[in-house]
Amino acid sequence: MKCFINFITGSKPSQYKKLGHAGIFRSSIPFSVEDFYKNHLEEGKVGSFFMRKIIIDCDPGIDDALAIMLAANSPELDILAITTVSGNVPSDMGAANARKVLKQLGRMDIPIYIGEEVPLREEYIDARDTHGMDGLGESFFPEVEGEYEKKNAVDFLTELLEREKISIIALGPMTNLAKVFSRKPELIANVEEMVSMGGSFKSHGNCSPVAEYNYWCDPDAAAVVYDLFAKAGSKIHMIGLDVTREIVLTPNRLEYMCRLDPEMGEFIRKITGFYMDFHWEQEGIIGCVINDPLAVAYFIDRSMCDGFDSFTVVATDGVCRGQTVVDSMNFWKKEPNSRILTETDSERFFAFFMERVLRKNDGSRWKKDE
């Protein structure tokens, strides 16, 4: 299976098509991940210059687990750390789940920082009705021994952004990020790109008529982050329900994954069975919507989704709690603080996901040098 690999390159620009953001080019030659590894990583041609430094801020969570699997198997990404926040599950349980996934991938080199336990103002309501009591579909994998990083995620992110420019893939409520940027708004200048799985434009909500769970769980945090990005003249790439609802892992796709890679396929089967039952009972869907991996795929390849720029605010109270109010008609005449993604190709996404994740390897290829 082939895919187009996006990467930062020192080769002649004339050989590549520009994707639309500085320094990133899309090769006109199809590469598999194996080809990319053989031709670049083994020969030492890819170092930190080629890889994009990222933080994954998440609340694992079934679909968060799948997103981590995709990110950890993508050679373009230098995962500096995973930070957890209370959302689908409490932040400490999310850290334990992230560790279980990293062990499965052979990526125990990635540090985990535990973040905020409760939303800024609202009572914390988890999503274990959707993700199971353990957050991984009641698979109840054994706990992975070891200590987490002692520093709180908010302090870690603050200190990291004071030192260097990074990108953030936010897959959960924005509580950690709201605390970081409220404390030091100037640090937004060191966020090269922010991709957030959350919100909705025209699609209905998944925990209220109008709201997606991540923003509904801590609406004040989402509102703060969108407001601060507007004041900083920056944009959040919003991977909302308009596109993620297209990404349905069906029983047929799951069976195909198990045939391609029995070990990894069975791991995915164990964590998604509960999720599939929930989607059938609640929405009549045969399969399950896996939101978060699309955010990772889009971060790697901008052509995975399409949309438009807009000024967006997040409602914080009443029946509209957590709703993303997108000024698509420019009534407010304000500079965009978001890119709203509205179109995606599910078949292309699943080809991308399976080509990267379903390979038998111990993950050591993508480990950072000791």
Would you name each region that the model predicts?
Residues 7-9, 13, 29, 33, ...:
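Short terminal hydrophobic/aromatic SLiMs and anchors at protein ends
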Residues 38-50:
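Short, Lys/Arg-enriched N-terminal segments with co-localized hydrophobic residues
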Residues 49-52, 71-73, 78, 216-220, ...:
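Conformational coupling and interaction surfaces
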Residues 52, 95-161, 336-344, 349-358, ...:
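Metal-dependent C-N hydrolase catalytic cores
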Residues 52-58, 62-100, 140-244:
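Active-site histidine-anchored catalytic micro-motif
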Residues 112, 225, 296:
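A residue-level signal for conserved active-site and pocket-lining positions in enzyme catalytic cores
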